[in-house]
Regions:
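Alpha-helix-centered segments that form part of catalytic cores
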Residues: 1-26
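C-terminal helical cap and adjacent loop that interface with cofactors, partners, or active-site loops
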Residues: 17-151
Length: 151
């Protein structure tokens, strides 16, 4: 610890790992995404909120609850269904374990793989494009970025 990188203060070091990032994405079909990542917070929790024209979904890994609220024509505004989910016991609240279980099931022929390599590569390219935007301060067109990195 005294001589290696693990003994260095994370605040007074050459550490250049991003600790806060906001990315805005616009998809071809008009869907927008606002992604915020912050390493330093009183509540170190992963949360998601999906907002649509007829409802929204909110979830938090800390409270193991998914809330679905519907609104609009024919729906009583403010009606929320609450689903309690079993907390994960391994990395990423059980997500790592779930990925491995699905992978093994696919290898055993117990289920069909519905996720293509192309989908996986594209999702990674989007993350790399967000990082490129963070580093350069420019808006990045993902299609153009993908062409440049895949060439």
């Amino acid at each position: 610890l005294e001589e290696g990188p693990y003994g260095k203060c994370v605040f007074h070091n050459d550490n250049d790992v991003v600790d806060h990032q906001v990315a805005s994405l616009l998809f071809e079909n008009g869907t927008t995404v606002a992604f915020t990542m912050c390493a330093f917070s009183d509540a170190c929790d992963r949360t998601v909120k999906f907002m649509g024209t007829r409802g929204e979904i909110r979830a938090s890994m800390d409270n193991n609850v998914i809330e679905v609220t519907q609104f609009g024509a024919g729906v009583r505004t403010g009606t929320t269904a609450v689903y309690t989910v079993k907390p994960g016991s391994t990395g990423h609240s059980g997500g790592d374990e779930g990925i491995m279980e699905e992978f093994v099931s696919i290898l055993k022929g117990e289920r069909e793989n519905t996720n293509t390599i192309a989908q996986s590569v594209h999702s990674h390219v989007m993350a790399f494009a967000a990082e490129e935007s963070r580093l350069t301060g420019r808006t990045v067109d993902v299609a153009d970025f993908e062409k440049s990195v895949m060439a």
